[in-house]
Regions:
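Conserved strand-loop elements at the edges of beta-sheets that form or border functional pockets
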Residues: 31, 53, 61, 79-81, ...
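Glycine- and acidic-residue-biased ligand/ion/polar-headgroup-sensing regions
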Residues: 55-67, 72-73
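Short acidic-glycine-tyrosine-enriched beta hairpin
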Residues: 73-89
């Protein structure tokens, strides 16, 4: 067993860049351990991930704000505080804040993350209309 004591582990909040659009900050809760990584992620309005998938899936727990999650080939689904999302292994998706709200979620990522192309402004607008 390991216990990770929040900010005591010395991890700093990180500005996320090349695999995100807009301003996104991640606060590492648990470093990659046994193929599991946990981050609290803050998205400014309209900010979002690129398309990606996870080798063993991902769990999102929305803690504040409003946002969207979109699976390839489908319309985006709204996210609100209190929502929990299970994304199966290798399912291509993106998630991020609504255009008029920030979004804060805890991301529990299982296995390797396969980062892909950016979600364009037109794709974001079309999926969330």
């Amino acid at each position: 067993m390991q216990i990770f004591h929040g900010r005591e582990n010395g991890a700093k909040s990180e500005s996320r860049g090349p695999t995100f659009t807009g301003q996104v900050w991640a606060d590492p809760v648990m470093p990659a351990t046994g193929g599991v990584m946990i981050n609290n992620v803050f998205f400014t309005p309209g900010a979002r991930t690129h398309w990606h998938s996870h080798g063993q899936g991902q769990i999102l727990q929305v803690t504040a704000g409003k946002g969207w999650i979109c699976v390839a080939g489908e319309k985006a689904q709204p996210l609100r505080a209190g929502d929990t999302v299970w994304i199966p292994a290798d399912e291509r998706h993106w998630h991020g804040a609504a255009a008029d709200s920030y979004l804060l979620h805890t991301a529990i990522s299982l296995g390797k993350t396969d980062w892909q192309d950016a979600v364009t402004g037109a794709d974001y607008a079309g999926a969330t209309a």
